[in-house]
């Protein structure tokens, strides 16, 4: 996994991104799977680091020209498991969150899974839902039985 994350950081550099912080192995930890938390600037949404799941501590900073452009960039992804919106204006944050194509969205914080709320992604981020009533349905096999009139509950009335 460490090799994979380091490969993505190298790809980003080769494509013109700049490492703002991190990008290597933590000092004093030459062994193990550790990679420094890394921030990449100058990332374009067409770069692999912006389009693929890295599964490591890498944050890509992608510039935008306002809310509409930010939503366009965020939705221009084959994935949509979860997202986050940060805004000093809660109504603006909610308006933006409603436009994002992700299965769950946090506004000004994190979104922990709640047992009673469905969890799952859009697009290529998973199939179906976990948790909540929607998650239960995948474990059920509903069926219907047609009853003759004599066996119906209201037959004696």
Summary of predicted features, one role per range:
Residues 1-4:
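Structural signature of PLP-dependent enzymes
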Residues 19-22, 107-109:
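General beta-strand structural signal in soluble alpha/beta enzymes
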Residues 27, 34-157:
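Conserved C-terminal structural/oligomerization subdomain of aldehyde/semialdehyde dehydrogenase
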């Amino acid at each position: 996994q460490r090799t994979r994350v380091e490969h993505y950081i190298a790809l980003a550099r080769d494509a013109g991104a700049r490492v703002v912080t991190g990008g290597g192995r933590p000092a004093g930890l030459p062994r193990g799977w550790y990679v420094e938390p890394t921030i990449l600037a100058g990332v374009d949404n067409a770069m692999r680091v912006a389009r693929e799941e890295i599964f490591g501590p890498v944050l890509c900073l992608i510039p935008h020209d306002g809310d509409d452009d930010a939503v366009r960039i965020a939705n221009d992804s084959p994935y949509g498991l979860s997202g986050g919106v940060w805004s000093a204006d809660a109504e603006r944050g909610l308006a933006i969150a409603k436009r994002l194509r992700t299965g769950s969205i946090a506004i000004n914080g994190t979104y922990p899974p709640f047992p009673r709320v469905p969890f799952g992604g859009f697009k290529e981020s998973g199939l179906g839902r976990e948790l909540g009533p929607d998650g239960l349905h995948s474990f059920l096999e509903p069926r219907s039985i047609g009853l003759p009139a004599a066996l119906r509950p209201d037959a004696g009335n």
